[in-house]
């Protein structure tokens, strides 16, 4: 279950997450943990993409939270344990920002990502970093993919109704009704 894994990461309990897997070691080797986190992110993205792309119902909300949480945690974990920065980053804060960033990008809903993550934390301490992360993620994805995951299939079929009345009417118009025989 993904929510248990998210809870483990947010409580900074990486060992509990790795227990029972091939990657569990008593001493908690950081390179093994980095590999473990990286593989989880990669496999989850591939599994969700294959399921949704194949017509199955793999969901979008929970996988977005899961991948975002793991990606943010992975980013902070790598920087903390490789000595690339002179200071220690908060794994929990980066996990939360990763959740907000991926959710804002996948669903094209930066405000929802900001407020939902703020509700999860129970405070407004991370409000500005969440705003920056969600805005950058949304602006970046908007350049590459103009439609959210929910409207993408309709747009590809040409059945997406927009807020522009003229475009919506032209979308609904059938050629058989326009051409005289």
Model-predicted regions and their roles:
Residues 179-181:
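Helix-loop-beta junctions that constitute the ligand-sensing/allosteric loops
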Residues 1-176:
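Alpha-helical transmembrane segments and immediately membrane-proximal extracytoplasmic
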């Amino acid at each position: 279950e993904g929510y248990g894994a998210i809870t483990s990461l947010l409580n900074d309990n990486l060992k509990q997450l790795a227990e029972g897997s091939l990657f569990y070691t008593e001493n908690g080797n950081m390179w093994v943990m980095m590999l473990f986190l990286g593989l989880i992110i990669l496999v989850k993205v591939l599994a969700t993409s294959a399921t949704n792309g194949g017509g199955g119902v793999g969901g979008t909300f929970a996988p977005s939270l899961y991948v975002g949480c793991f990606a943010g945690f992975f980013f902070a974990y790598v920087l903390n344990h490789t000595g690339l920065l002179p200071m220690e980053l908060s794994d929990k804060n980066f996990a939360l920002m990763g959740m907000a960033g991926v959710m804002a990008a996948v669903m094209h809903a930066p405000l929802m990502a900001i407020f939902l993550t703020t509700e999860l934390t129970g405070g407004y301490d991370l409000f500005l970093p969440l705003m920056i992360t969600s805005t950058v993620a949304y602006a970046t994805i908007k350049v590459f993919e103009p439609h959210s995951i929910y409207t993408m299939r309709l747009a590809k079929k040409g059945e997406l109704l927009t807020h522009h009345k003229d475009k919506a009417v032209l979308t609904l118009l059938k050629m058989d009704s326009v051409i005289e025989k």
